[in-house]
Amino acid sequence: MQLDILKDYLINKSCKNNNKIDGNSLYQNEVSSKNDEKSLYHDKVSLYLTKFSLYYDKLIEWNSKFNLTAITQPQEVQIKHFVDSILPDDLLGESKNICDIGCGAGFPSIPLAILNPDKKFTLVDSVNKKISFINYIIELLDLQNVTAIHSRVEDFAKNNYQSFDACVARALASMPTLVEYTLPLIKKGGYLFAYKGKNYNEELEQCSKILEILKGKLQEVKQYDLTEDEKRYVIVIQKIGDCPKKYPRNGNKPRLQPILG
């Protein structure tokens, strides 16, 4: 499959990160070095696109049997799954050990893992068929930095208390529920990166109490342009202390009885 939208995004991203050549440089060796950097990055982009293309093909193939996603058209998958997943790639920073709760078909962590082979991603989902798909993709794309685990969030959190530098979550739950699911997993000083749409403010207003209980602090809300008409917001929560080990609550209470206020 041709991934022109994703390709353009990755190349433009490299330019914004100062990888493009400065034609006004006074030093030939500096120009040569930047040429080398640009060539190397284009080689990386080719490798990325090969993996993303395989990912797309198998997503569509498995989707016919297991209903992994409602988004299947090539252009939509590139924008709403691939580009959307990697928009906040710059926020990961020094986070090396990252957890994705409710990973579904692998978004956002599989795209992030393709771009960040130096970071370890642990993907968790309670639906076994989704984990089976993720394991297939891990092997197909040789993603040695990805592990998939079949588990309920509550059980996984109890056994992995404050084990991760960061958590990412996309299209999983409202902020009060999401905070209770993820902050117990995050080390002090680590971050939650929550992908949200334009109505994120209402959710934030409802989670001040659970943030206080679980020692989380709103750091920032990062805005990205997904398309000319659509924006994506990533809510960044920092873990500033140790949270009580009794969270998240059992029995699906974080979702059914969220702590609001």
Predicted feature residues:
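Class I SAM-dependent transferase core
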Residues: 3-20, 24-26, 37-94, 132, ...
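Residue-level signal for inorganic ion chemistry
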Residues: 59, 112, 196, 237
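Short loop/edge segments at beta-strand edges and connector loops
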Residues: 72, 150-151, 222
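Conserved SAM/SAH cofactor-binding pocket of Class I
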Residues: 83-171, 179-180
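Helix-to-beta-strand junctions that scaffold the AdoMet/dcAdoMet cofactor pocket
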Residues: 186-187
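Glycine-centered, small-residue-biased loops immediately flanking beta-strands
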Residues: 190
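Short strand-turn motif at the edge of the Rossmann-like AdoMet-binding core
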Residues: 195-199, 223
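SAM/dcSAM-binding transferase cores
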Residues: 205-261
